[in-house]
Amino acid sequence: MLFIILLSLCIYAPLAHWTWHPDGFLRKLGVLDFAGGTVVHMSAGFAALAGAVFLGKRNTHRNGHASSPANIPFVVLGTGLLWFGWFGFNAGSALGANGLATSAFATTNFALAAAMLSGVFWDAFNGRKISALGACIGAVVGLVAITPAAGFVTIGQSLFIGFASAIVCNLVVYVFNNKTAIDDTLDVFPCHGVGRMCGMIFTGIFANGVGFFYGQTTTSTPSRTWLNSFLI
């Protein structure tokens, strides 16, 4: 309970002010975050990393035996609930029933679908049996990655964001599980922390009107690519 209170007051609240308040210094710099990629997922991802480092490995991992998921149907059910709820999370950030909300709704769905397929392909590429767990991890990464970009990109761009972000995050999951002593039980940092990094970079690249590829930049208006990357 104390951790939740401290995280909300000391981490989430300052990030929300910096990013969304008209006087926030990140907002003034031009950083783009449509629905909380930085505010929500960066804070959660890095808090999870800090917790995993502080608490250390579980006993099963100390003995060299990684535990398998307890209940795959519940994983699938939870992913489905996240999928449905994320529509309100992203589309609701348009603050109205309008075209922007519709666009955010669509890009969210397509990014998730692309990331889910990417997770399936990752299993196949590595010679593993295609699993529901891999698809669900990919789906969550797609949702995280599209969160900062949902209202700023097209459907085609959202497909790329979801697919590419899932590949990057699966690489990080592999490194964490096989090359480090960090026991991130639910892969929160790779999915939310790294997924957010990918999403913010792609937002800076693809954002309609102001992105690196599609926007007009001047010496007085730096590219959003670098502004969004600043947070990494």
Residue map of PLM features:
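Glycine- and aromatic-enriched membrane alpha-helices
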Residues: 1-232
